[in-house]
Amino acid sequence: MAAKQITFNADARMALKRGVDKLADAVKVTLGPKGRNVIIEKKFGAPTVTKDGVTVAKEIELEDKLENVGAQMVKEVASKTSDVAGDGTTTATVLAQAILTAGLKSVTAGANPMDLKRGIDKAVEVVVAELRKMSQEVQDKNRIAQVATISANGDKAIGQLIADAFEKVGKDGVITVEEAKGTETTLEVVEGMQFDRGYLSPYFVTNPDTMEAVLEDAYILIHDKKISAMKDLLPILEKVVQTGRPLLIIAEDVEGEALATLVVNKLRGVLKVAAVKAPGFGDRRKAMLEDIAILTGGTVISEEKGYRLENATLDYLGQAERIIVDKDNTTIVGGKGDPAQIKARANQIRQQIEETTSDYDREKLQERLAKLAGGVAVLKIGAATEPEMKEKKARVEDALHATRAAVEEGIVPGGGVAYIRAIAALDKVEVENEDQKIGVQIVQRALEEPLRQIAANAGWEGSIVVQRVKEGQGDFGFNAQTEEFGNLLEQGVIDPTKVARTALENAASVAGLLLTTEAVVAEKPEKEKAAAPSPGDMDF
């Protein structure tokens, strides 16, 4: 085990602060619409050019072990904020630095760090409550476009695309981001329910040009086991043939005699049919089959429920206006299920989303909800070069995340103004002693910092801008894009409430931990061992 270097008290805190400052100074130049770029050198490939705070933070690793501990703590602020809210990473870093800087001065002057932290925590609670009071709901497409535009660093085209995507699939829909083949950025919407299983035999194709099987006004047979014997399938097939309507079979697998008979009947024109494997695996497969059954008004023919395939009737089959099957995907459009049952199923999935602790499960549940409730939109990002593509894709993902946050918790005026308006509420905070009061004052000062930095990046004097905004009321603030003062909500300069809230909570949490640190244990840098002399250097 390598030897450790232990540092105490002021030395430890000052070393941590140096690390925090190095990281924060590199990150905060990106804040606001006039934020500057940071170029990140890569070991392989082209350098990355970014204006995204968390991307800069993640790349920073300091040589000094103690300083690096401080930098890593603040990096955690940025990435946690990005994970939860999708934006606000730079704001969180600026706030953490401001709280830590003011806090360390007070600790050095003799204040009790624990009381400072209690004061900071009380202040944050009050500010969060104030932000919630200020918050306005986001409903119309225009507002969604404004939120997305700001998160995408002022790119109106991206903002509009995201607003279109939300309009098409609703707030429960899934919106994914992919790289496009060309330079155009486009939006594709898949209506209905799509799952990633294609036809089991190319002989099921009805349109040889597109290699798709298209079934209009079709029945759907949903079975959770393999179908290999034709005798099991025959009774229901005969009933479907009499109706003259096409049939889609979804089962664990269709093989052997059953598959061969289906193909022969399809080729002879006796029955328009296609067969696909059931989506998913294990318990998720059962749940997805149940989703398809509810969406189409059918029943999963499962022996666990006491249903047998040979006894199936037309009442067990689901129905849909149109089904498109290609070699990779199946899309069911216009399922004829009972709307009340579909809604109840969607609510059940929403409940599971709230209760689950696994991010993976949550993502999969959200996909299922989207397929039931709205649909899936795919944003295909185009760019001229690889570095531009990466940068643009990261911006779109951020903007998407932030827009979801806005739809979830509402919006507040942007440009650091919401924090300025919350400062007054801190005058009334009840504290137990003088040090806690100092903690509250530290947060009051720190809340001005994001606006100062936005103004400074736009080439203005921060304190003059802060004073001018303080003199105004409500949504009055500084629009760094146009370099004018005015009503920020009307001008579309807005932040999701969740972003403003998460940035402050995470910043105060880490700054509070750093302030109450008394010792840091870090690995000692290993001394380079002298290389053994090579035989050529020896005298014989």
Curated annotation (Swiss-Prot):
Q: Where in the cell is it found?
A: Cytoplasm
Q: Which GO terms describe its biological process?
A: protein refolding
Function as written in the Swiss-Prot or TrEMBL entry = Together with its co-chaperonin GroES, plays an essential role in assisting protein folding. The GroEL-GroES system forms a nano-cage that allows encapsulation of the non-native substrate proteins and provides a physical environment optimized to promote and accelerate protein folding.
| PROSITE patterns xref list | CHAPERONINS_CPN60
What does the record give as the organism's lineage?
Bacteria, Pseudomonadati, Rhodothermota, Rhodothermia, Rhodothermales
Cellular component, GO, one term = cytoplasm
EC annotation from Swiss-Prot or TrEMBL: 5.6.1.7
Q: What is this protein called?
A: Chaperonin GroEL
Q: Which organism is it from?
A: Rhodothermus marinus (Rhodothermus obamensis)
